[in-house]
Every structure is written in C-alpha cells, then in structure tokens.
Amino acid sequence: MSEEFTGPPWAVDCTQDAEKYRLGLPEAARDALWEVLFELRTSHTPYRGENVEPARSTVPRGPHIAYFDGFRGWIRFTFLPRVAEPQIVVEEIFWQ
C-alpha cells in the first residue's frame, strides 16, 4: 500500500438501513440508483457533479445529496478521502 492519494474508482458501502431500502426498490429505480453510484465511483471529486449538492451549506465537506431517476430519488452520502482505501458511504436512500 502506498502513501499516495489514490483515484477513482472509489469503494462504495451502504449502511444496513440504506441497503434494506435499496433492495426494496423497483428494478427501474435500482437501475437509476446504480447509474448515480457509478458516476460517483468514477468521479475524480465525488462532491462535485451535476446532480450533487451539500446536505447543509454550512458543512461543505460533510454529507452530500445526489439525485437520481429524474430527481424522483436521492441518496445522502459521505466521501471519506482517507489515504488508504478512500470510500463513499451511502447513509440514506429515498425514492418516490
């Protein structure tokens, strides 16, 4: 393992509640969710993107919201830019 900053693709992990919700989504919504997760995984900076915004404007490096399926759903995630194994943690998923 090197001490250099690694780049994408980032690892993605979900909390247990988010994973349960993901498994209950209809197939079309799950596909849209995978698309946004793929974009986050391969983005050089996951906190920047067309459909990404901070959950709270006062905490720019805190949790962010990424929208999917034409803004019908969103995920709240945090990017942990550790030197060893940086990852994206999906904390909450919502779809309507």
Predicted region positions:
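Basic, Lys/Arg-enriched alpha-helical interface segments
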Residues: 1-73, 80-96
